[in-house]
Amino acid sequence: MHISIVAVGKLKEKYLIAGINEYTKRLSAYAKIDIIEVADEKTPERASELEEEQIKEREGGRLLAKIPHDAHVIALAIEGKMQSSEQFAARLDELATYGKSKVVFVIGGSLGLSKQVMARADETLSFSKMTFPHQLMRLILLEQIYRAFRINRGEPYHK
């Protein structure tokens, strides 16, 4: 399976980079993992709703340009479907079983994802009703993907 994470913004925090590198290394035994970053837009402090939508559209255009046409796209969004780690593992296994060899997870910027990106998504996933920094979501997502592969292979993993 080839898994890509397409995300808005460049990581700067060393602790996040270290964690992402660790999980990318661990996952290399199970799948090919790519992390693709697209430029984020500066959001004015008191941006209007229209300005925020325009920013999401510009970021969304960059995200869509990085998604292969034959990929199964999972958008991370608060309004997405919540799953347990076991359900998420079963879903990844199901995608592999049905020949979905390219899976792309999309993480938006601080304003979220554009309507165009949400329309392109084959499904949406939520990790919580809480809001997390989009940079941190990359690490959380990688950990859950790693956990899913361990669950699917019957390998021990900390609960």
From Swiss-Prot:
Positions bound to S-adenosyl-L-methionine: L76, G108, F127, S128, K129, M130, T131, F132
Subcellular localization(s) per the UniProt record: Cytoplasm
Coiled coil: none
Alphabetized Pfam families for the sequence: SPOUT_MTase
SUPFAM superfamilies from the UniProt entry: alpha/beta knot (SSF75217)
Annotated catalysed reactions: pseudouridine(1915) in 23S rRNA + S-adenosyl-L-methionine = N(3)-methylpseudouridine(1915) in 23S rRNA + S-adenosyl-L-homocysteine + H(+)
A GO term, aspect molecular function: rRNA (pseudouridine-N3-)-methyltransferase activity
GO CC annotation: cytoplasm
EC number, UniProt record: 2.1.1.177
Keywords: Cytoplasm, Methyltransferase, rRNA processing, S-adenosyl-L-methionine, Transferase
Cited HAMAP family: 23SrRNA_methyltr_H
Functional summary from the UniProt entry: Specifically methylates the pseudouridine at position 1915 (m3Psi1915) in 23S rRNA.
Family: Belongs to the RNA methyltransferase RlmH family.
UniProt subunit comment: Homodimer.
Annotated NCBIfam families: PRK00103.1-3, tRNA_RlmH_YbeA
Name recorded for this polypeptide: Ribosomal RNA large subunit methyltransferase H
Native organism: Geobacillus kaustophilus (strain HTA426)
Gene for this chain: rlmH
